[in-house]
From Swiss-Prot:
The RRM domain mediates RNA binding; the RNA must have four nucleotides for efficient binding. Mediates the interaction of NEXT complex with promoter upstream transcripts (PROMPTs) and potentially aberrant forms of other non coding RNAs, such as snRNAs. The RRM domain exhibits specificity for polyuridine sequences. The keyword Nucleus applies. Residues 88-107, 119-137 have a biased composition (Polar residues). Residues 211-230, 237-252 have a biased composition (Basic and acidic residues). RNA-binding subunit of the trimeric nuclear exosome targeting (NEXT) complex, a complex that functions as an RNA exosome cofactor that directs a subset of non-coding short-lived RNAs for exosomal degradation. NEXT is involved in surveillance and turnover of aberrant transcripts and non-coding RNAs. Binds preferentially polyuridine sequences and associates with newly synthesized RNAs, including pre-mRNAs and short-lived exosome substrates such as promoter upstream transcripts (PROMPTs), enhancer RNAs (eRNAs), and 3'-extended products from small nuclear RNAs (snRNAs). InterPro entries: NEXT_complex_subunit, Nucleotide-bd_a/b_plait_sf, RBD_domain_sf, RBM7_RRM, RRM_dom. Signal peptide: none annotated. One of its GO terms (biological process) is cerebellar Purkinje cell layer structural organization. It comes from the Eukaryota. It comes from Danio rerio (Zebrafish). CDD domains: RRM_RBM7 (cd12592). The keyword Membrane does not apply. This is RNA-binding protein 7. Keywords: Nucleus, RNA-binding.
Length: 252
């Protein structure tokens, strides 16, 4: 693998913020394709310079990363991405901006073609701890929670309505069965009442006959006792005593 091949797989990234690290650049450019390494050069005092070199595993990732990420903002600074000096992509028409052979940040012109990040279609990039990843906003999470709560309430209401409907159907079915059973049980009630009334009437007539005979017998005994007593207590005329005796003999 020669130097030219490595240059074809490398991008120059300028106008970096001093807070940007090699790890941040690595994770940022990883979305364009697999990487081999990221290098931020240092000056004689050991301070990081404001540009970096990104080395991709595949050459096809280089122009794709340039079109995808050139002009985005990182820590408030707009990145200036170019092909590295010596890259064959520079000589290809429409692949490299003017004066791209000089990688020095001091001579770096604006981003390619003067296109803004909005024209490139790439969002701004600000990482948490140096990198930011996509996440759901609080409003989105709140709406999702409200939708979930509404769905749960609707399901509970449907379950309650279903249980009430089933209970009502069971009660209606039980009332219908009970009414039919009671109707069947009362079908012979008029005849039974007539039978009871007939029996009560017969018993009542027998009791009346018995009571009448008993009173007649007591009345005859009374007259008989009065006649034997000699009439000391009461004086009855002879005709009445005779009638009493005749009634007594007739009774017996």
């Amino acid at each position: 693998m020669g130097i030219a091949d490595e240059a074809d797989r490398t991008l120059f990234v300028g106008n970096l913020d001093p807070q940007v690290t090699e790890e941040v650049i690595f994770e940022l450019f990883l979305q364009a394709g697999p990487l081999i390494k990221v290098k931020i050069p240092k000056d004689n005092e050991g301070k990081s310079k404001l540009f970096a070199f990104v080395n991709f595993k595949h050459e096809v990732s280089v122009p794709y990363a340039l079109n995808l990420l050139n002009g985005i903002r990182l820590h408030g600074r707009q990145l200036n991405i170019k092909f590295k000096t010596g890259s064959s992509h520079i000589n290809q028409e429409g692949k490299s901006p003017a004066n791209s052979q000089n990688p020095s940040p001091a001579n770096t012109p604006g981003h390619r073609g003067g296109r803004t990040p909005e024209q490139m279609g790439s969002p701004s990039y600000s990482p948490p701890q140096h990198m930011q990843r996509p996440f759901s906003s609080p409003d989105t999470l709140q709406r999702q929670a409200m939708m979930n709560n509404m769905w749960q309430v609707q399901m509970q209401q449907l379950q309650m309505l279903s249980g009430t409907f089933q209970q009502g159907m069971q009660q209606l079915r039980g009332n219908a069965d009970g009414g039919w059973s009671g109707h069947r049980g009362q079908r012979h009630s008029p005849q039974d009442n007539n039978n009871h009334q007939g029996r009560d009437q017969r018993h009542g007539n027998g009791a009346n006959n018995y009571e009448r005979n008993r009173r007649d017998g007591q009345r005859g005994d009374f007259y008989h006792h009065d006649d034997r007593s000699g009439g000391h207590n009461r004086n009855y005329p002879p005709d009445r005593r005779r009638d009493s005796r005749e009634g007594r003999w007739k009774h017996f």
